[in-house]
Amino acid sequence: MDPVIIAFCCYQUGYGAADLAGTSRMQYPATVRIVRLPCTGKFDITYALRAFQKGADAVMVVGUKKGECAYETGNLKAEERVRFAKQLLDELGIGGDRIDMFFMSAAEADKFVSAVNEMTARVEKLGPNPLKAQ
């Protein structure tokens, strides 16, 4: 099974880390789809719900390190939304473990790769998105 993971990345840090991982030829699963956001503070729970509805197996939200958000508190707002999304996904029977928030700087390509590998391993244990069977 090749799990599909949607990574919502802030332009300043998360996307920079993903880009650096790519230009450094670091290896991570090719089934990760990156959606660039101006800031993770722009992330909305409906983005995750739509991703799961369309067949994603997991969602990552990748923002700046705490205290280093270019928009001051955007990453903290996203963290709250992800926490709520976890509860909602549990209630819906999809599973809150299918979404997580990661914090890193643009220079931490290795941390991006580790986060992707962590989510991939998690999805392999959980199995495919239960909505795919419907």
UniProtKB/Swiss-Prot annotation:
What is the cofactor note? Binds 1 [2Fe-2S] cluster.
Instruction: Give the required cofactors.
Output: [2Fe-2S] cluster
Is Iron given among the entry's keywords?
yes
Keyword annotations of the record: 2Fe-2S, Electron transport, Iron, Iron-sulfur, Metal-binding, Oxidoreductase, Selenocysteine, Transport
Cysteine pairs bridged by disulfides in the record: none
Which Pfam families does this entry report, sorted A to Z?
A: FlpD
Its Enzyme Commission number(s) read: 1.12.99.-
Listed InterPro entries: MvhD/FlpD (IPR003813)
| Keyword check for Transcription | no
User: Which GO molecular-function terms appear in the entry?
Assistant: 2 iron, 2 sulfur cluster binding; metal ion binding; oxidoreductase activity
What does the record note on quaternary structure? The F420-non-reducing hydrogenase vhu is composed of four subunits; VhuA, VhuD, VhuG and VhuU.
Protein family (similarity comment):
Belongs to the MvhD/VhuD family.
Stated name of the protein? F420-non-reducing hydrogenase vhu iron-sulfur subunit D
What is the primary gene name for this protein?
vhuD
